[in-house]
Amino acid sequence: MMNVDLDKIQQAVRMILEAVGDDPDREGVLDTPKRVAKMYAEVFEGMHIDEEQYFETVFSEDHEEMVLVKDIPFYSMCEHHLVPFFGKAHVAYVPRGGRVVGLSKLARAVDTVAKRPQLQERITATVADSIMRKLDPHGVVVVVEAEHMCMTMRGVKKPGSKTITSAVRGMFEKDAAARAEVISLMR
């Protein structure tokens, strides 16, 4: 919860309650500003964490085949409406020189990047670019599929619709067969 101004968030939530016509001193919402401030500190904790730290500890393994962690659940907040979007991320890379990281580090990187006011496209690209920068693999593919509450509960109101984004780096950009293989494994 470092660098989060809880008091400012509480004041803002109190003002929102007043602005929509509610009484912020009403019993049911009396502690809402405090709860929302605590929740925002948690769901935006990625603002104060560098996802690349998870790729500092590298293991040397005689492995230059694909590594894929799929169905990594995540939750994020749309930066346009500050409502949630959530889904699954699939992260694959082909190590170079046997440089591998613990599998949990891929999931931690996804979580950290998602815990910011965010766009799905940016989550996808940031995770891929961080892996490329820190591990220097032969290639990376990140696919993210999510449902956006800004499309479900407001606006077009299309519950169940999914948005899919991908980031393709390194060998996967030019090698169509390798790209097709990893995409089929992610399904």
UniProtKB/Swiss-Prot annotation:
| Keyword Metal-binding assigned | yes
* Known pathway: Cofactor biosynthesis; 7,8-dihydroneopterin triphosphate biosynthesis; 7,8-dihydroneopterin triphosphate from GTP: step 1/1
* Entry keyword annotation includes RNA-binding: no
The record's catalysed reaction(s) read: GTP + H2O = 7,8-dihydroneopterin 3'-triphosphate + formate + H(+)
Q: Which UniProt keyword terms apply here?
A: GTP-binding, Hydrolase, Metal-binding, Nucleotide-binding, One-carbon metabolism, Zinc
Q: Which Gene3D superfamilies match?
A: 1.10.286.10, 3.30.1130.10
Its GO CC terms are: cytoplasm
**What biological-process GO terms show up in the record?**
one-carbon metabolic process; tetrahydrobiopterin biosynthetic process; tetrahydrofolate biosynthetic process
The organism's superkingdom is given as: Bacteria
Q: What is its EC number?
A: 3.5.4.16
Any one Gene Ontology MF annotation carried by this entry is:
GTP cyclohydrolase I activity
Which InterPro entries does the protein's record reference? Answer: GTP-CH-I_C/QueF, GTP-CH-I_N, GTP_CycHdrlase_I, GTP_CycHdrlase_I_CS, GTP_CycHdrlase_I_dom
Query: Binding positions for Zn(2+)?
Result: C78, H81, C150
Q: Which family does it belong to?
A: Belongs to the GTP cyclohydrolase I family.
The subunit structure is:
Homomer.
Report the HAMAP family cross-referenced here: FolE (MF_00223)
Protein name, as recorded: GTP cyclohydrolase 1
- Which organism is this entry from? Brevibacillus brevis (strain 47 / JCM 6285 / NBRC 100599)
Which gene is this protein's source? folE
